[in-house]
Amino acid sequence: METSSPALSVAIGVLAVLFGLTGFGVYQAFGPPSKALDDPFDDHED
């Protein structure tokens, strides 16, 4: 069986990290932790 190139392994690793960070960001923005976020526009009165 052929061995995969190191570049393919690095690319898959980088993609996995990017997808993980994207998923974590979406979870923070829209999941249960989002209840603790403040809206600075609502806090500021003109």
Curated annotation (Swiss-Prot):
Membrane-crossing segments per the record: 7-27
Primary location class: membrane
UniProt keyword list: Membrane, Thylakoid, Transmembrane, Transmembrane helix
Keyword Transmembrane: yes
CC annotations in GO: plasma membrane-derived thylakoid membrane
Topology class, membrane: Single-pass membrane protein
GO biological process terms, semicolon-separated: photosynthesis
Any single Pfam family the record assigns to this protein: PsbN
Protein function: May play a role in photosystem I and II biogenesis.
Family as reported in the entry's similarity comment: Belongs to the PsbN family.
Protein's recorded name: Protein PsbN
Organism of this sequence: Synechococcus sp. (strain CC9605)
Gene: psbN
